[in-house]
A protein has these predicted regions:
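Short, solvent-exposed loop/turn elements at domain surfaces
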Residues: 204-206, 393-399, 534-536
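Bulky hydrophobic/aromatic "packing anchor" residues in well-ordered structure
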Residues: 195, 385-388, 404, 533
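Short hydrophobic/aromatic segments of transmembrane alpha-helices and their interfaces
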Residues: 187, 216-217, 390-391, 401, ...
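Mature catalytic domains of secreted/periplasmic carbohydrate-active enzymes
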Residues: 1-318, 324-339, 350-362, 367-369, ...
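Surface-exposed loop and turn segments in beta-propeller and other repeat-based domains
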Residues: 466-468
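Aromatic, loop-rich ligand-recognition surfaces of beta-strand-rich domains
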Residues: 248-258, 263-379, 395-463, 473-532, ...
Length: 542
């Protein structure tokens, strides 16, 4: 899937709709077409081809002008769906910010959907479509209970807002398919989940992230918590400035591929491909190949007959006793169950609860080599917080710089966060980490960052002034200034919360600065780098 146009509006193909495209680029003297080159490469190597087209366009003058922009957008979509052969997937997100005129656009999703069905009827429509839905985060983690048969009405339908509101569900809801909620729904949709995550901390290439490519252990954990949780996995790989995938990313992808092949190439379960129609409370035993060391079990339902398993129990038999290995809920297309390694003689799968009869298509037993995360530690700042002093009496503000992303400073109102660093600094940037739990209230979207020598006279630092996409990807945002700003005080001024609420929250804030010579009465200078915050596989932070 190629990002043919992102929110900046720049088109990677020679569109007739705007000059803001490869036509105006020195690359190939304006005669290049990135989309076509990728399409040809996909055909050459037997890969399916998909496009991402951002509906939000911060460059188009007609954005925010209703029908004018919808016609403009559908014309771009039409070019992509008619000039590049078969398109297997069309991917939209729901981003809907302001355009260059300060206005927001109301998208005509039904007209967009009709265009796709007319031009590429076999294409899968993802996220803002009705074939594949967004899992609700960009961390690479799916729900442990994931129903593909769901009550969530796809957002492209005009009735979606009313029906979803009536049920109290939205894309991030934990329960999208339990019996209770299905009984209250007017419609049920086959709407499987897609887990989206980047191999790097961000979605675009930055050389400073070359050492922060996700570790093999982290990628393997993502695989088990996405594909292994009845979801499909979309792994973002950003090309570098040469147009190629960076060698660090390539190396990790090869390691990841080898790990998955080695894990699943040998199935230690005998007759695991035997189909089984399982009613609630029924069990099936499987013999295990002699002396096999195992730690992973796979279950698949025949989804052509629906998704029906609600809960299951997995047991292993050795030394004359049955022992519980794992318990779980939904299965769907695929469920991967990890457990402590053992050498069982037999495996027993019990379907504790199912909707009518569950159609078990396949089971398997494997050994996944344990991995250790040796990835580089994420540095949230290099200015020690030990000298920081708060401006005010609210001591709970210290939660915002206690080196723990799980503690959060929360307050009513858009409250300015002000700190005295304890000495002068040449400040070069900062980091902002939003809350890492399900409560994102108070997450800062738009902001102003200022520095001061005396705490009274403030200078505004030149920044974009917004944490883009933080609503959908609430991870640490790093802001690096083009110049340094000398000051002893800094303040982060919230201008807008992600949902327009009057509240503020900060899980962690860090400051980057150039080390200064110590004064006569000072012995400490800012270390570069400083002691980083250590994060482990499975932590919410990237």
């Amino acid at each position: 899937v190629i990002t043919a146009k992102h929110h900046d509006g720049f088109c990677l193909w020679p569109t007739k709709t705007t000059r803001h495209s490869v036509v105006s680029s020195p690359w190939k003297n304006g005669k290049g077409d990135v989309v076509r080159e990728l399409r040809n490469a996909c055909k050459k190597y037997g890969l399916k081809f998909g496009i991402y087209l951002s509906p939000w366009d911060r460059n188009a003058e007609c954005y925010g002008q209703g029908d004018a922009y919808n016609r403009f957008f559908i014309e771009q979509l039409t070019e992509l769906l008619t000039n590049y052969g078969e398109v297997h997937e069309v991917w939209f997100d729901g981003a809907n910010g302001e355009g260059p005129n300060g206005k927001k656009q109301i998208y005509d999703w039904e007209a967009i959907e009709r265009t796709i069905r007319r031009l590429q009827p076999k294409a899968v429509t993802a996220v803002m479509g009705d074939d594949v839905r967004w899992v609700g985060n960009e961390k690479g983690i799916g729900r442990k209970t994931e129903w593909s048969a769901t009550v969530l009405t796809p957002g492209i339908y005009s009735r979606a807002i009313g029906q979803n509101k009536e049920l109290g569900v939205f894309g991030k809801s934990k329960d999208l398919g339990s019996r209770d909620i299905v009984a209250r729904a007017k419609e049920l949709f086959w709407f499987p989940s897609e887990v989206d995550v980047s191999i790097r901390p961000g979605w675009f290439y930055h050389s400073k992230e070359d050492s922060h490519v996700k570790s093999l252990a982290h990628l393997a954990d993502i695989y088990f918590k996405s594909v292994g949780y009845n979801s499909v996995l979309l792994l973002n790989i950003p090309p570098d400035k040469s147009g190629l995938i960076h060698e660090n990313d390539c190396r990790r992808l090869k390691e990841f591929s080898t790990y998955l092949k080695n894990t699943f190439e040998k199935d230690y379960l005998k007759r695991g491909r035997t189909r089984w129609e399982a009613l609630s409370g029924t069990s099936k035993e499987y013999m295990v190949r002699k002396d096999a060391l195992v730690n992973t079990f796979m279950i698949q339902e025949d989804i052509t007959k629906g998704q029906r398993v609600e809960s299951f129990l997995l047991e292993g038999y050795w030394d004359g006793n049955w022992r519980t290995l794992a318990e779980g809920t939904t299965v769907g297309y695929k469920r991967l169950v990890r457990f402590t390694e053992c050498q069982p003689e037999k495996i027993r799968l019990t379907i504790r609860s199912a909707r009518n009869a569950a159609h078990i298509l396949r089971t398997g037993l494997f050994y996944a080599r344990p991995l250790t995360d040796n990835s580089a530690k994420v540095q949230l700042g290099n200015v020690p917080v030990s000298q920081w002093r708060l401006s005010g009496t609210d001591e709970t503000m210290r939660k915002a710089f206690d080196k723990n992303v799980q503690t959060v400073w929360r307050t009513e109102g858009l409250k300015t966060f002000t700190v005295d660093l304890g000495r002068d600094a040449e400040i070069t940037g900062f980091s902002y980490t939003p809350a890492q739990d399900d409560n994102l209230a108070g997450t800062i979207y738009k902001y102003r960052f200022e520095v001061s020598m005396d705490g009274s006279h403030w200078k505004t630092c030149a920044t974009s002034g917004e944490f883009s996409n933080i609503m959908h990807n609430p991870v640490t945002c790093f802001v690096h200034f083009e110049q340094s700003y000398r000051g002893r005080f800094f303040r982060l001024v919230p201008l807008a919360e992600i949902s327009g609420k009057p509240c503020t929250s900060i899980a962690e804030i860090g400051i980057f600065a150039v080390a200064l010579p110590a004064k006569d009465d000072e012995s400490a200078v800012y270390p570069v780098p400083g002691a980083p915050l250590t994060l482990k596989v499975g932590d919410a932070h990237p």
